[in-house]
Structure formats: structure tokens, C-alpha cells
Amino acid sequence: MKVFNLNEDIKFENQERILIKTGSDKNLLQLARKDKDLKAKYKELLANDYILYFHDKETSRFCKREHVNKLFNGLNLVQYKNVFYRLSQPQGRKVNDKVSKKLIVIFAKMPGAQQYDSPKIPHRMLPPFFDDLERSLVKNVYTMRIMDTNVSHGSHYINTTNYPDYEQEIQESIENVRKNLDIEKENVVFYGVSRGGAGAIYHGTALDYKTLAVDPILNIGGKLEANDRRILKGLRINDLVPTVNLNVANSNKYQKVIICSENVPLYYEQSMRINNEKIKVLNMKDDKITSHPEVSPNTVPEQLMILNNLLSGISV
């Protein structure tokens, strides 16, 4: 298998794997952060539908997205077309056959700082999040956790130039799970934080499902571009707000909630553009919240209250 050097033009021939010799312990993604030419090379790989999956012996390894399933042995992932997810069922005391089956669909959050630029796909695209969530939910809840398997750090579950059918396949995968489990639409909730919040509110409004989105990344352009930190510029649309507002104008039978905070003005400004006559937007005033990553951990009780309300239909 040919190994390309950093200064060498990559010859794209639809090959399954592409190897890049970085000459460093750092992977190409890490190097791209500080070098615009390497960033352009990295984005060229993304645009041609390659995903970084490993770095060893000073070599970064990329795999064509349609073949990444070969890398996921032992990860307990279910594949629907090119969408990957984990599905768990209620266990032990969380089973109650006297109430309807329910489904929570979780869209992955962004990885933490230590794994943000990890060469491993699961670290970037399905990082651990609220692994014991089911313990705090009503009974009979199935959980579907969707990996954001696209480009560098996922595309926040949005179509990209290299994957124009992504949204459709995500929505089909959810409908497939719901129908196979024989769960009524009214017993399904979409949920996500940050990147996952964007996915939840985008697809939740597209399909009209109950939704909780926590400080969603609704726009990656303008003041939120941040030197293309998410490595998505030019690969997908920037602003999701017009589509979300159009979706709820067309159909909005089921309740949708966004949690945000005025203490994080860049994200708050975007949430304030949402049609709050159709979607409930909650501004959490809390001095403990000083940045985007702090919104979710400081609103866990509120999130659980809303999720259980949406799942059970019980409100006081």
C-alpha cells in the first residue's frame, strides 16, 4: 500500500485506505491545526470521503467512509446503510410491561479536550455521554445512540458534499428502529447536547418528534466559525436555524425544548433566532455557566425533568 509524504499530492483512486507519513508522533489532524497547507490537505481527504482512523509509526491512516464498518469489530455497533448506532433495551427493574415501550434517540456530543483530535473514530464521533442515563428515566425506555460518522469530527448529523444522503439515512435508521420495536411515535424523544443538540433539533423538527436540545450548535459560520475549528467550512451549510424554523412551521405536533444560557452569548444568540412560539427556549441564568461546555453539566436536573416529562406525558 502506497504511503504518501506530507508534501506529496495525494492521488485519489477510490482506494479503501490512504496512508500519510507525517514524520511525527502527531497525527495529520493535530498537525493541521497549526499549518494551513496541512489543513488544506486534511480537508481534501475529508472532501473525498476519507476518515482518519489510526496513527502509528509516524503514519496517519485514513479509510474510505463506506468501508469504516471493517474497523468497528467489538464495538457493539449496529449498521443501517452507512449509519452506525448502539441500541440498548431496558433491564431488570427498568422493565415494566404494563406501560408502553419508549425510545430515546441520543445524538453524540463533541469529544472532550483530551480526545478532541484523537485519531480514533469512536473518540471523535461517539464519545462517552451519560452512560447511566437510563437509571434516571422512567421505565421501559430503549436507547439508540447514533454515531456521527462523517468527515473529521462528524458533521453534526447534517448532509455534506461528500455524503449528501446522510440526513435521509439517519432518519431512515431511526424509523427502522422505532418500527422494529413497535414503538408509537408519541413515545419517542430525540436528545442531544452541543453537536448532538444540533442533530436532535434538526432531525426532531424534520420528522416532528419530541425533542430536547441542550445548547445546540445551530450555526458554524460568522462569529462561530472559530478558525474552522470543527473543520466543516465548505463541506456543509453553516446555518441550521432557517431550516429548523421552516420545519416547525410545516409540522409541530410534538413538544420541542431548547436549553441555552445568556452567559454563553454566541450560542445564546443563535437559540434566540429560533421560533419560540413553536419551540420552548429556556434561558438558564446561572453564574456557574461561563462557557458552552458548562451548559449541560449545570442543567442536568432540568434535563432529566424534561426528558421524563416528554417520555411519560406526565406534567404537574
Model feature map: region roles:
Residues 12-101:
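A domain-start/cap signature at the N-terminus of enzymes
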Residues 77-141, 145, 149-153:
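Short, surface-exposed "cap/lid" segments of acyl-processing enzymes
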Residues 157-181:
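Alpha/beta-hydrolase active-site loop
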Residues 182-194:
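Alpha/beta-hydrolase fold nucleophile elbow
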Residues 192-204:
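Glycine-rich nucleophile elbow surrounding the catalytic serine of serine-hydrolase chemistry
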Residues 213-223:
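Active-site nucleophile loop of the alpha/beta-hydrolase fold
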Residues 222-294, 309-313:
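The feature captures the conserved acid-bearing segment of alpha/beta-hydrolase catalytic domains
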Residues 298-316:
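Catalytic active-site module of serine/aspartate enzymes centered on a nucleophile-bearing elbow/loop
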